[in-house]
């Protein structure tokens, strides 16, 4: 008998002990959570927790406002 499909539970990359701190000045970290068009990738794809997704979105928006990240990529 075949095993039923089992979906592995993803864990938040920011919840571990040695996890990076979400900072608006850390452009390299923030770019990993943007699509190739510059949009914020949803947490169901990146497996980021709800609390950390809000922090991440706020940091990305802050970095965009001061010019560290582009609003859109053509």
From Swiss-Prot:
Name the keywords, alphabetized: Ribonucleoprotein, Ribosomal protein, RNA-binding, rRNA-binding
Q: Which SUPFAM superfamilies match?
A: Ribosomal protein S18
> Tell me, what is an example of a GO biological process annotation in this record?
translation
Q: Any one cellular component term from GO for this entry?
A: cytosolic small ribosomal subunit
Spell out the PROSITE patterns in the cross-references: RIBOSOMAL_S18 (PS00057)
Q: Which PANTHER family match?
A: 30S RIBOSOMAL PROTEIN S18, SMALL RIBOSOMAL SUBUNIT PROTEIN BS18M
Q: Which family does it belong to?
A: Belongs to the bacterial ribosomal protein bS18 family.
The protein's name is: Small ribosomal subunit protein bS18
Q: Which organism is it from?
A: Sphingopyxis alaskensis (strain DSM 13593 / LMG 18877 / RB2256)
């Amino acid at each position: 008998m075949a095993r039923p499909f089992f979906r592995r539970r993803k864990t938040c990359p920011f919840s571990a002990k040695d996890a990076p701190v979400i900072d608006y000045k850390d452009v390299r970290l923030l770019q990993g959570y943007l699509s190739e068009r510059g949009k914020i990738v949803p947490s169901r794809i990146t497996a980021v927790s709800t609390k950390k997704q809000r922090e991440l979105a706020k940091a990305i928006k802050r970095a965009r406002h001061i010019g560290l990240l582009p609003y859109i990529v053509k």
